[in-house]
Protein backbone atom coordinates (compact mmCIF):
# COMPACT_ATOMS: atom_id res chain seq x y z
CA UNK A 1 0.00 0.00 0.00
CA UNK A 2 1.50 3.31 -1.09
CA UNK A 3 1.79 6.08 1.49
CA UNK A 4 0.86 9.62 0.42
CA UNK A 5 1.61 12.76 2.41
CA UNK A 6 -1.03 15.47 1.91
CA UNK A 7 0.13 18.99 2.75
CA UNK A 8 -2.51 21.75 2.83
CA UNK A 9 -3.75 24.26 5.40
CA UNK A 10 -7.41 24.06 4.33
CA UNK A 11 -9.32 21.40 6.36
CA UNK A 12 -11.95 20.92 3.64
CA UNK A 13 -9.28 20.06 1.06
CA UNK A 14 -7.47 17.79 3.51
CA UNK A 15 -10.70 15.92 4.25
CA UNK A 16 -11.62 15.54 0.58
CA UNK A 17 -8.15 14.36 -0.42
CA UNK A 18 -7.68 11.88 2.40
CA UNK A 19 -11.18 10.46 1.87
CA UNK A 20 -10.62 9.87 -1.84
CA UNK A 21 -7.06 8.60 -1.43
CA UNK A 22 -8.08 6.11 1.26
CA UNK A 23 -11.05 5.10 -0.88
CA UNK A 24 -8.48 4.18 -3.53
CA UNK A 25 -6.57 2.13 -0.94
CA UNK A 26 -3.73 4.54 -0.24
CA UNK A 27 -2.40 5.21 3.25
CA UNK A 28 -2.44 8.92 4.03
CA UNK A 29 -0.40 11.25 6.21
CA UNK A 30 -1.36 14.89 6.82
CA UNK A 31 0.57 18.10 7.43
CA UNK A 32 -1.01 21.54 7.79
CA UNK A 33 2.16 23.60 7.30
CA UNK A 34 5.51 23.38 5.55
CA UNK A 35 7.61 22.77 8.67
CA UNK A 36 5.48 19.82 9.72
CA UNK A 37 5.55 18.50 6.15
CA UNK A 38 9.35 18.32 6.21
CA UNK A 39 9.32 16.54 9.57
CA UNK A 40 6.83 13.90 8.40
CA UNK A 41 8.51 13.42 5.02
CA UNK A 42 11.88 12.79 6.65
CA UNK A 43 10.46 10.44 9.26
CA UNK A 44 7.91 8.49 7.21
CA UNK A 45 9.54 8.47 3.74
CA UNK A 46 6.22 8.62 1.82
CA UNK A 47 5.83 7.31 -1.72
CA UNK A 48 4.26 10.57 -2.95
CA UNK A 49 3.63 14.08 -1.63
CA UNK A 50 0.66 16.25 -2.62
CA UNK A 51 1.89 19.73 -1.72
CA UNK A 52 -0.02 23.01 -1.68
CA UNK A 53 2.00 26.10 -2.61
CA UNK A 54 0.39 28.52 -0.14
CA UNK A 55 1.34 27.25 3.32
CA UNK A 56 2.16 28.78 6.71
CA UNK A 57 5.65 28.42 8.26
CA UNK A 58 7.32 27.43 4.97
CA UNK A 59 5.56 27.73 1.62
CA UNK A 60 5.28 24.85 -0.82
CA UNK A 61 8.02 26.19 -3.09
CA UNK A 62 10.55 26.19 -0.26
CA UNK A 63 9.41 22.77 0.95
CA UNK A 64 9.73 21.36 -2.57
CA UNK A 65 13.23 22.82 -2.94
CA UNK A 66 14.39 21.33 0.36
CA UNK A 67 12.84 17.93 -0.34
CA UNK A 68 14.37 17.78 -3.79
CA UNK A 69 17.82 18.31 -2.27
CA UNK A 70 17.23 15.39 0.06
CA UNK A 71 15.33 12.84 -2.03
CA UNK A 72 13.59 12.02 -5.31
CA UNK A 73 10.15 11.53 -3.73
CA UNK A 74 7.48 12.37 -6.36
CA UNK A 75 5.72 15.69 -5.71
CA UNK A 76 2.42 16.95 -7.12
CA UNK A 77 1.89 20.66 -6.45
CA UNK A 78 -1.54 22.18 -5.76
CA UNK A 79 -1.81 25.74 -7.08
CA UNK A 80 -4.38 28.49 -7.55
CA UNK A 81 -5.23 29.82 -10.99
CA UNK A 82 -3.45 33.12 -10.37
CA UNK A 83 -0.17 31.51 -9.27
CA UNK A 84 1.31 30.89 -12.71
CA UNK A 85 4.81 32.03 -11.74
CA UNK A 86 4.76 29.75 -8.70
CA UNK A 87 3.66 26.82 -10.86
CA UNK A 88 6.57 27.35 -13.21
CA UNK A 89 9.01 27.75 -10.32
CA UNK A 90 7.68 24.60 -8.67
CA UNK A 91 8.27 22.59 -11.82
CA UNK A 92 11.71 24.09 -12.30
CA UNK A 93 12.89 23.11 -8.83
CA UNK A 94 11.72 19.54 -9.25
CA UNK A 95 7.98 19.03 -8.79
CA UNK A 96 6.74 16.19 -10.99
CA UNK A 97 3.38 17.75 -11.79
CA UNK A 98 0.85 20.33 -10.68
CA UNK A 99 -2.93 20.52 -10.39
CA UNK A 100 -4.82 23.82 -10.43
CA UNK A 101 -7.49 24.55 -7.82
CA UNK A 102 -10.39 24.00 -8.01
CA UNK A 103 -9.54 20.60 -9.42
CA UNK A 104 -11.39 17.48 -10.43
CA UNK A 105 -10.82 14.73 -7.88
CA UNK A 106 -10.97 12.19 -10.69
CA UNK A 107 -8.20 14.06 -12.51
CA UNK A 108 -6.03 14.20 -9.40
CA UNK A 109 -6.52 10.50 -8.65
CA UNK A 110 -5.47 9.68 -12.22
CA UNK A 111 -2.31 11.72 -11.81
CA UNK A 112 -1.54 10.15 -8.44
CA UNK A 113 -1.85 6.69 -9.96
CA UNK A 114 0.38 7.59 -12.89
CA UNK A 115 3.09 9.30 -10.84
CA UNK A 116 3.22 6.37 -8.42
CA UNK A 117 3.41 3.86 -11.25
CA UNK A 118 6.28 5.79 -12.81
CA UNK A 119 8.12 5.97 -9.53
CA UNK A 120 7.66 2.30 -8.71
CA UNK A 121 8.30 0.78 -12.14
CA UNK A 122 10.20 3.61 -13.89
CA UNK A 123 7.53 3.34 -16.63
CA UNK A 124 9.97 1.84 -19.11
CA UNK A 125 8.95 -0.74 -21.65
CA UNK A 126 12.28 -2.53 -21.92
CA UNK A 127 14.87 -3.77 -19.44
CA UNK A 128 17.61 -3.60 -22.04
CA UNK A 129 20.20 -0.81 -21.66
CA UNK A 130 20.35 1.82 -24.38
CA UNK A 131 23.54 3.51 -25.55
CA UNK A 132 23.45 6.59 -27.75
CA UNK A 133 26.96 7.85 -28.36
CA UNK A 134 28.23 8.98 -24.92
CA UNK A 135 24.90 8.39 -23.15
CA UNK A 136 24.05 5.04 -21.54
CA UNK A 137 20.75 4.26 -19.83
CA UNK A 138 20.07 1.05 -17.90
CA UNK A 139 16.36 0.96 -16.97
CA UNK A 140 16.68 -2.28 -15.03
CA UNK A 141 19.05 -0.61 -12.59
CA UNK A 142 17.74 2.93 -13.08
CA UNK A 143 21.27 4.03 -13.94
CA UNK A 144 22.29 6.78 -16.35
CA UNK A 145 25.79 7.74 -17.46
CA UNK A 146 26.88 10.56 -19.74
CA UNK A 147 30.51 11.02 -20.76
CA UNK A 148 31.16 8.09 -18.38
CA UNK A 149 29.85 10.05 -15.39
CA UNK A 150 26.85 8.93 -13.35
CA UNK A 151 23.72 11.08 -13.52
CA UNK A 152 21.39 11.41 -10.56
CA UNK A 153 17.92 11.45 -12.16
CA UNK A 154 14.44 11.31 -10.70
CA UNK A 155 12.05 8.71 -12.08
CA UNK A 156 10.42 11.36 -14.27
CA UNK A 157 13.75 12.66 -15.60
CA UNK A 158 14.95 9.13 -16.32
CA UNK A 159 11.74 8.28 -18.17
CA UNK A 160 11.98 11.46 -20.22
CA UNK A 161 15.58 10.85 -21.23
CA UNK A 162 14.86 7.16 -21.91
CA UNK A 163 11.94 8.08 -24.17
CA UNK A 164 14.10 10.50 -26.15
CA UNK A 165 16.88 7.90 -26.37
CA UNK A 166 14.50 5.24 -27.69
CA UNK A 167 13.63 7.68 -30.47
CA UNK A 168 17.13 9.11 -30.92
CA UNK A 169 17.35 11.37 -33.95
CA UNK A 170 13.56 11.71 -34.18
CA UNK A 171 11.67 14.83 -33.19
CA UNK A 172 9.21 14.21 -30.35
CA UNK A 173 6.41 16.73 -29.96
CA UNK A 174 5.49 17.92 -26.50
CA UNK A 175 2.17 16.11 -26.82
CA UNK A 176 3.94 12.83 -27.66
CA UNK A 177 6.23 13.22 -24.67
CA UNK A 178 3.27 13.94 -22.40
CA UNK A 179 1.53 10.81 -23.64
CA UNK A 180 4.55 8.50 -23.43
CA UNK A 181 6.26 9.85 -20.31
CA UNK A 182 3.51 11.39 -18.19
CA UNK A 183 1.18 8.63 -19.30
CA UNK A 184 -2.24 10.26 -19.26
CA UNK A 185 -4.36 12.82 -21.06
CA UNK A 186 -2.83 16.00 -19.74
CA UNK A 187 -5.28 18.68 -18.63
CA UNK A 188 -2.82 21.57 -18.33
CA UNK A 189 -0.38 23.16 -20.74
CA UNK A 190 2.76 21.57 -22.12
CA UNK A 191 5.02 23.66 -19.91
CA UNK A 192 5.70 20.63 -17.74
CA UNK A 193 7.71 19.20 -20.65
CA UNK A 194 9.77 22.36 -21.09
CA UNK A 195 10.60 22.64 -17.41
CA UNK A 196 11.48 18.94 -17.16
CA UNK A 197 13.81 19.33 -20.16
CA UNK A 198 15.40 22.34 -18.45
CA UNK A 199 16.04 20.33 -15.28
CA UNK A 200 17.39 17.44 -17.33
CA UNK A 201 19.81 19.70 -19.19
CA UNK A 202 20.96 21.09 -15.86
CA UNK A 203 21.99 17.62 -14.75
CA UNK A 204 23.55 16.75 -18.11
CA UNK A 205 25.61 19.92 -17.82
CA UNK A 206 27.45 18.36 -14.89
CA UNK A 207 29.01 15.95 -17.39
CA UNK A 208 29.18 18.19 -20.45
CA UNK A 209 29.56 21.90 -21.16
CA UNK A 210 26.96 21.71 -23.93
CA UNK A 211 23.93 19.65 -22.79
CA UNK A 212 21.75 21.47 -25.30
CA UNK A 213 23.65 19.68 -28.09
CA UNK A 214 22.41 16.33 -26.75
CA UNK A 215 18.77 17.28 -26.14
CA UNK A 216 17.98 19.61 -29.02
CA UNK A 217 15.05 22.03 -29.15
CA UNK A 218 13.23 21.94 -32.47
CA UNK A 219 11.53 25.31 -32.34
CA UNK A 220 7.77 25.18 -32.67
CA UNK A 221 7.72 21.38 -32.63
CA UNK A 222 9.40 19.72 -29.66
CA UNK A 223 12.66 18.01 -28.77
CA UNK A 224 14.99 15.32 -30.02
CA UNK A 225 18.04 13.51 -28.74
CA UNK A 226 20.98 13.95 -31.10
CA UNK A 227 22.21 10.48 -32.03
CA UNK A 228 25.50 11.96 -33.27
CA UNK A 229 26.43 13.83 -30.09
Over which residues does each language-model region extend?
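Charged docking surfaces used in two-component/phosphorelay signaling
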Residues: 12-23
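Short, Lys/Arg-enriched segments at the junction into DNA-binding effector domains
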Residues: 2-3, 114-171, 175, 209, ...
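Hydrophobic residue at a beta-alpha junction
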Residues: 31-32, 40, 55-58, 85
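Basic, amphipathic DNA-recognition helix from helix-turn-helix-like DNA-binding domains
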Residues: 59-61, 65-69, 74-131, 202
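His-Asp phosphorelay/catalytic-motif detector in bacterial-type signaling
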Residues: 45-47, 70-75, 187
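Active-site beta3 strand of CheY-like receiver
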Residues: 44-50, 55
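Short hydrophobic/Thr-rich beta-strand motif most characteristic of the beta2 strand and flanking loop
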Residues: 6, 25-32, 36, 40
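Active-site residues of response regulator receiver
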Residues: 8, 52, 79
Amino acid sequence: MATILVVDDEPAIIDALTYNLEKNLYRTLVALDGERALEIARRENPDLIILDIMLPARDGIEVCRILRQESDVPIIMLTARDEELDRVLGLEIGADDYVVKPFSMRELMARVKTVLRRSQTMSVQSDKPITVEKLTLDPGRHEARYHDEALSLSALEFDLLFCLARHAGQVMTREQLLDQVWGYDYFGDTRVVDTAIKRLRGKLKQSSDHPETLVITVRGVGYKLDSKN
